[in-house]
């Protein structure tokens, strides 16, 4: 039976904009199971990244519940969030956020304590085995982003969250990056949510949602 990895229930989030209270997320529900790759699209400022931050336990909702692997984590003390994020969630950001003084493979082996042979296997799967001993400054933008993708999949995390992973890449490299995410989601039976403006990569996901007026609507 396929396990539900993430469930967002009746999520609300508002911000104060001067004298006005602006509702960003309005009664949002979302469920993602293992092996599913979901995309969220919509204009800038519509709440996509806010929703991703709530799903990733980086931000608390004003109302609603976040369930991760069946547990209502929104009810847990905040000091437990860091441990859960580290163990259960992998992040892929717009900016790869690689440390310049660590080689590509060391971004996983040093920071995540991943065994060298496991790093080599993952890099081989992603077609970047040849750059494992290169520093980030020597890599192209596409190569740096692929290392960031490898880093997200190097742990036992069941949930992968990608925030505009193609933003700094050209069309071809952007599509390749998302193809790699898709491949690893299905191969490793992860659940993944990608926020993107790049509609050229939407054919690679299993489900698409559009954020409009604070609500999430299936496409």
Predicted features, each with a name:
Residues 135-139, 143-145:
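Conserved ABC ATPase signature
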Residues 154-158:
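A short, proline-enriched helix->beta-strand linker immediately N-terminal to the Walker B motif
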Residues 73-90:
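ABC ATPase NBD coupling module
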Residues 64-72:
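Conserved ABC transporter NBD signature motif
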Residues 160-163:
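Catalytic Walker B motif of ABC-type/P-loop ATPase nucleotide-binding domains
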Residues 72, 116-131:
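Conserved ABC ATPase "signature" region
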Residues 56:
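Helix-to-loop junction immediately C-terminal to a conserved catalytic motif
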